Amino acid sequence: MRRGAAWALLLAAALGLGARGVRAAVALADFYPFGTKRGDAVTPKQDDGGSGLQPLSVPFPFFGAEHSGLYVNNNGIISFLKEVSQFTPVAFPIAKDRCVVAAFWADVDNRRAGDVYYREATDAAMLNRATEDIRRYFPELPDFSATWVFVATWYRVTFFGGSSSSPVNTFQTVLITDGRFSFTIFNYESILWTTGTHASSGGDADGLGGIAAQAGFNAGDGHRYFNIPGSRTADMAEVETTTNVGVPGRWAFRIDDAQVRVGGCGHTTSVCLVLRPCLNGGKCIDDCVTGNPSYTCSCLAGFTGRRCHLDVNECASHPCQNGGTCTHGVNSFSCQCPAGFQGPTCESAQSPCDNKVCQNGGQCQAESSSAVCVCQAGYTGATCETDVDECSSDPCLNGGSCVDLVGNYSCICVEPFEGPQCETGSYVVPSPCLSNPCLNGGTCVDADQGYVCECPEGFMGLDCRERILNDCDCRNGGRCLGANTTICQCPPGFFGLLCEFEVTATPCNMNTQCPDGGYCMEYGGSYLCVCHTDHNISHSLPSPCDSDPCFNGGSCDAHEDSYTCECPRGFHGRHCEKARPHLCSSGPCRNGGTCKETGDEYRCTCPYRFTGRHCEIGKPDSCASGPCHNGGTCFHYIGKYKCDCPPGFSGRHCEIAPSPCFRSPCMNGGICEDLGTDFSCHCQPGYTGHRCQAEVDCGQPEEVKHATMRLNGTRMGSVALYTCDPGFSLSVLSHMRVCQPQGVWSQPPQCIEVDECQSQPCLHKGSCQDLIAGYQCLCSPGYEGVHCELETDECQAQPCRNGGSCRDLPGAFICQCPEGFVGTHCETEVDACASSPCQHGGRCEDGGGAYLCVCPEGFFGYNCETVSDPCFSSPCGGRGYCLASNGSHSCTCKVGYTGKDCTKELLPPTALRVERVEESGVSISWSPPEGTTARQVLDGYAVTYASSDGSSRRTDFVDRSRSSHQLRALAAGRAYNISVFSVKRNTNNKNDISRPAALLTRTRPRPIEDFEVTNISANAISVQWALHRIQHATVSRVRVSVLYPEDTVVQSTEVDRSVDRLTFGDLLPGRRYSVRLTTLSGPGGAEYPTESLASAPLNVWTRPLPPANLTASRVTATSAHMVWDPPTPGISLEAYVINVTTSQNTKSRYIPNGKLVSYTVRDLMPGRRYQLSVTAVQSTEQGQLHSEPAHLYIITSPRDGTDRRWHQGGHHSRMLRNRPAPLRLPELRLLNDHGAPETPTQPPRFSELVDGRARVSARFGGLPSRAVTVRSQPTTPVPLKNTEAPEQARLALQLPKNNSKDTESTPGSCSEDTCQNGGTCVPGANAHSCDCRPGFKGRHCELACEKVPRPCTRLFSETKSFPVWEGDVCHHVYKKVYKVHQDVCFKERCQSTSLKKLKQESN
């Protein structure tokens, strides 16, 4: 191409010229494979529905965040975070977590036509195809390899309001990732509709017009988004003809970063990189159709046009309702509402309910100038704030407990009651025999009115309480009358059946004799003799019965001068004082026999089937053969029987079965129908099931579009109330649906849009347009206002486009169009090349109403009419490129030059340097070019900074008055190439630049915010950290720094990023250390900063040393005295913790004395084995630090002896025996000494120590220390000298091994040593035990144990003193305070050594 023609082509591209792709689309064969045969799932055929949450096998990065699940929505989008049922697309950006990938967001209705398929794919064929596509469309990522693909396909779907014959669309979304980068590919096969017919979308019957589909990406934060060109405009019908990757109908994007990046051309074929034609922040997208380079501008919201150069007038659609005034802004509008209206578009009339908040679902109802809350069932109060307690009326019966619910209650019934109010059921009467009323081994039998006791031989009575008397048991000297009878003749003063009762002494029965045969009468504690002799008295005498002379319940009958006693049955005598036993009172007749007395005898009349004196002999039982079936009860008659059948059965032997309906199998009032061997239940309304056991449940009713539903349940009689959205009214009289007895809901209502135009509100022949919850008047020319009541200036609406000027006329206007535009509104761009103005073969290029002739070589001029080339003389020299135009030339200067003919040198800035480096920014500075002339030439500086991998690039312009700049929004830990150019701005929008001043720097990596200490000992600290896969992706090394105590020099260690833990050893015990972490990025030794800010220091204390040389100096039956070395100089301890452990429990004692070097443990049990441990406690500002415990094992002495055992650490057990002196010890000889003592020795006391290894040490009091050696033959005896000084002698005796022939094996001996792993056998009284080496446990030391560290919390007690005044004396009160301290605990894990050895041998 010739030079002039090349520049013309570039100029044409800058003006927005250049061919778009021809009508094409991606064939279905070029889609990623889909369909049920490929294993795809299909979304439900539901309006505005979707797939529900689909968990992902790998996280998917999107806008800088990772997502583990997604939703495939029927309306053409894939959403994260939550499902999106919005069917009318909303302009991006959108907040409220609307995180979406939109291939074609519109009102899809797959119920009418089409399917929505989706699947997650990781097979090799899909991954290979995705890898090839991404490497082709993003050549800067040649090493990309896909590991996961998700495919969603909307196949032949139609729009809401369409039918099976309406136009259909097919498009596809493909998500691809390798775990780090993520991409989206959109494939469009046919796009025949863009809009649904719902009123909010505004589409026509063909699915066109109104608010068209939205395509692009939205981060959900209200800020970040990306639109595919044509979104929400009629151009979406042509989306299958556009592309950014050279394939019409296919778009590819990278979407893992904070901003969407488009795929496309290389640097050599990119129009966007050369011209940058998009204005007002628009995103330039190369179309990259092979052989025809072109571009498309993705405009920010609020701008439109080929180059995003036109500001969208949001007021043109008259969004403000009810007379509101619209004010236009950039990508926005605002409405100034008239009085009585409110809302973003003045759509809502102000109501008293605007400031009334009804709680708990209450609905506000305006009444004149006030507002009232209509509460939901179960709530009351002015704002429905009070929950009604439905349990206050005690609705639950039969002991049921009531649970208050919202608008209802529930009864929890006790068995056997049930029902909504526990009203159904009855108590089961317990058997009277459950209390075992029969005594003395009697058998209880249930009866109709109670129970009957069958008594064993020798007992009788209702509960077998009375014993049958076979012999005479008369008491108090009574005499038995007759054989085998119970009649006793009692001596004077006693009465009763067995003469068991003593007659009470009274004044009249103590041998008192009245003269003349008079009778005695008690009177006032004395007696009175009533004589037979007549006496004349004038006053009344007391009655003879006043003294109550009759005993034992006898009744007194008074006569004139005497009385008689009428005795009760069983007594006789004048005063009823003599007992006559009732022979039948003892119940001698058994088995229901009737007792009758005859004189001094009784006779038993026996019932059927019994005989004998006492009816004790049974007759044959006719019921013994069990003739009654089905649980019938057999009753005896004289020679006969009768069956008492259970309910439902009949017949002589209860052999006839009841009807299937007998037991009332139908529940809840159902009517039972007998079907012979089966039954059928006719249920009451509201119940269903074979036995009417289930309530009718209609399920969840379907939603009604444009309506809000309130539901009080799904059982029969439940009601679903529907409230139409504003602007809609019910199509039927009822606004509710009722759950019917058949288990289905009644017919739903429909919300039909209200036609507010029926009242003809528009004046002056204005036409009314119905809106949702309102209307809009389209006024006739010359009128305006809410109701077209005002005459208007037609030019106020700015009807003239493309810079045309408006002239107002009565009821009309005229647009005076600028050159290049025609039409009523100057809307049509004139094809300036239609008249072929270019001469001499010049090529005409149209642009914005004007034309440009690209002249062949040798011609120039506006129409190529001049045959001369102003550039022939090379006016620009070698410093620029010459371009001829209209007989003149212009120079495009090369880098480093400027001026009309590029004669001035444009010098770069000097002394470029980095001032400060942060995680997301870099501050740089420079010096202006040297020389006054060089400084005056430039207009400013261009600062270009790009990441070293080429993933991002930005250029900022800096005024020439400044010499520093802050680069922002950089990625942490990345290397950036920074170039600063001197810039000279020209009038033709072509800028001249100098050579760059460049440098390479790297931002700081992100620090490690969280790291932890995993283990602490007396001389080591272990720390652990974690690097985030994305946030620390640029970190190459980690520096761990430690500041030692009393040292100002920080010691550091650097480790590779693969290392996540480090242990510092050789530390001092009980000291504080400060640990810091710093991340490093970039190669080592780089000259620019590569390290992050240091993390906050973590102060850690090492543990103090455990007490050293812990020993037991004295062990008794109930105590043990321990001693240990003082702590290391320079370490100040606060306390010690003494733990006493047995096989059953552990007791801990806190001793608040850090200088303690000994302690006596008391209250021990004799002859028991104990583990004693001592832990040192050091106090720090972080709390208390505990050392590892020092252990000591002891065995206390038995009470009848003073033997003691202990062992220290891993040493063998020792046993200390204190032996009393023998009664007489005249002489003690040692085997290796000579001579005899001069004087008889006194009885010495000695102690011997058995250490469990067949060695004995003995200590003698009052003897010199001499060694004893065991020899095969004894040597000459050596006498021991007896001295008065308390000197001691030690004898070390080597005991023979247990396998000696003369060793007797006892149950507690160690003759058979079963201790494993080096354990030492310790003999005992009844059995031996094993003293295990450290690291082993078990009865035979068969378990290998290790301590595993883990973080834990410890509860420590601390004794503090508080000064208290009492009177004039100050003293201290000690109080124990408990603290919780974070610590590292050790959990012991044991494993059998035999099992461990077996595993090692198997490996």
Curated annotation (Swiss-Prot):
Domain spans labelled NIDO: 103-258
Coiled-coil regions, chain positions: none
Keyword rRNA processing among UniProt keywords: no
InterPro entries (UniProt xref): EGF-like_Ca-bd_dom, EGF-like_CS, EGF-like_dom, EGF-type_Asp/Asn_hydroxyl_site, EGF_Ca-bd_CS, FN3_dom, FN3_sf, Growth_fac_rcpt_cys_sf
Residue ranges occupied by any Fibronectin type-III domain in the UniProt entry: 908-1006, 1007-1105, 1106-1200
Domain EGF-like stretches: 268-309, 311-347, 349-385, 387-423, 429-465, 468-500, 541-577, 580-616, 619-655, 657-693, 753-789, 791-827, 829-865, 867-903, 1306-1342
Post-translational modification: Phosphorylated on serine and threonine residues. N-glycosylated.
This protein's record includes keyword Secreted: yes
Domain Sushi: from-to ranges: 696-753
Listed name of the protein: Sushi, nidogen and EGF-like domain-containing protein 1
Protein's organism: Rattus norvegicus (Rat)
Gene (UniProt): Sned1
